[in-house]
From Swiss-Prot:
Pathway: Amino-acid biosynthesis; L-arginine biosynthesis; carbamoyl phosphate from bicarbonate: step 1/1; Pyrimidine metabolism; UMP biosynthesis via de novo pathway; (S)-dihydroorotate from bicarbonate: step 1/3. GO terms for molecular function: ATP binding; carbamoyl-phosphate synthase (glutamine-hydrolyzing) activity; glutaminase activity. Residues 1-203 are annotated as: CPSase. This is Carbamoyl phosphate synthase small chain. It comes from Bifidobacterium longum subsp. infantis (strain ATCC 15697 / DSM 20088 / JCM 1222 / NCTC 11817 / S12).
Amino acid sequence: MSQNESGTIAIPMYDKDDAVLVLEDGQVYVGEPYGALGETTGEIVFATGMTGYQETLTDPSYDRQIVVQTFPHIGDTGVNSEDPESSRIWVAGYIVRDPSPNVSNWRAEGSLDDDLTKNGIVGLSHIDTRKLVRHLRSAGVMRAGIFSGDALTDQATGALKTIEQLLEDVRNTPQMQGLSLYDEVSTKETYTIEPCGEYEGKEPLYTVAAVDLGIKGMTPHRMAERGCRVHVVPSTITFAEIESLNPDGVFFSNGPGDPEQAGPEIELLRQVLDAGYPFFGICFGNQLLGRALGFGTFKLKFGHRGINQPVKDLTTGKVEVTAHNHGFAVDAPIGKQVDAPFENGKYGKVFVSHIDLNDDVVEGLQCVDIPAFSVQYHPEAAAGPHDAAYLFDRFCELMKNNSKEGK
């Protein structure tokens, strides 16, 4: 959508059977409804994976976000009960170029369209997603809304709503920067994942307290595969409650929202570090470690979201293809060890261990003097490549060494 010479919004043609996407900067895309009819607003972002759409939809880190798939053809393999990463769909809305009219996969239990409809997820299809993504890369992610069905009608007059009316709804949506969302997606009660695979039925090698800030289901499973008993605990847990679990290590998960607004979790993490527990953080957990150490965080222009992001391990020189979902990053110096800024270097030396090769964004932190490290990306690989699975082994090794030395 463009503006005319007078500066007013140029209104595209649409009717009550269409679905309309409105961006906060005034751009409008008219397509077809996909999934449920209605209205949804949130931060519009794009994901670059060719596969793994079911894992994307159920990732709690996408809370309050409208997701655009850059790959044009989505839905071929349908949906099943094995691939979700949580108990529900978390995206606020979903946009695809060309949804598959047929499902063709031996594991499929239904269609993506039906699943979105059943779960009340408002979506849109048959727009130029390439044009949309190019705009988001240029202008940055922003607030947006999808409107279809009765949401396009002014209930007072019975007429179609104007773009100005829809735009007002979009601009009344909270900005992602400044939002605290992890309590919204966290489990309310502790649950436990026992060792599995070759360790099934055996005594656990290690006990992990995993703080759920929006955890994906595959993450504790990756630890359980390595002989860990994983207590997944609510974000509201206290340090005393963590200690009562007698963990060998503590894990902070991925999650949505602005890390600057996670003050209680940052203080909890500092208590964990002060007590000498081995610590591993992923995604939001990486950002919280950064802030606990005294570094800042900032919002990326359009973020990293997809299962094909190149990351370089600066300690080995190896490049990994990794899965990402983050719109914020840690502001830390690259290429040297520095004193962690918090309380004049209380936590000793730290260095950036990984960077994204597309934009040099910090993708990992390694503490030198305390048993703590984190990565910004997703080594659990759900969906995505398994290049970074070694990080779970590193966490186990950290717990093993810490046990020998005595915490």
